[in-house]
Amino acid sequence: TEAKMWDLMEYDIPVAREIQDRFNCQTDSKFTKVLAGGYMPTHIDPGRTAVVMFSLTDNPSPIIYFDGQKKLFTHQYKCATIINAKIHHGVPVNTSDRIAFQVNLYLTWDEACKMHQKGTLYDSHI
């Protein structure tokens, strides 16, 4: 099995930029795709601390968090989800194409959680 994955970091999609611009912190964004039969290796993200994931495909394979080789928990995306990118995570089994729009956050995890709880992380007003 191979990774079969890619990132699209340069794009001109106005609605994606509008979503990214509504975050009240430093962000950048990208689209990711992992093909069916591929996988996303277990990793800790090197720069970003948190990621807001917008799944663009139905029933994406779940993300799994690890402590060494031990599974901590499995999360099935059903809506936009913020993840802690500094905990080992991956998608070891990908049964269908998995496409997502990701907004990368560079706050500490605690700062991101506090802003989310206060309703200040994202400006939802049009």
Roles of regions detected by a PLM:
Residues 38-42, 89-92, 109-114:
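Short catalytic/ligand-binding loop motif for oxyanion handling, primarily in non-cytosolic enzymes
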Residues 17-85, 99:
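Catalytic core of non-heme Fe(II) oxygenases with the double-stranded beta-helix
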Residues 96, 106-126:
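Active-site or metal-binding loop neighborhoods of secreted/extracellular toxin and effector enzymes
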Residues 86-101:
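Ligand-binding loop in jelly-roll beta-barrel domains
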Residues 47, 93, 106:
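Alpha-helical and His/Cys-centered functional microenvironments
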Residues 1-24:
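Non-heme Fe(II)/2-oxoglutarate
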Residues 56, 103-107:
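Short beta-strand-to-loop capping motifs
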Residues 11, 64-66, 112-117:
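Short, charged, solvent-exposed linker or helix-capping segments at domain edges/interfaces
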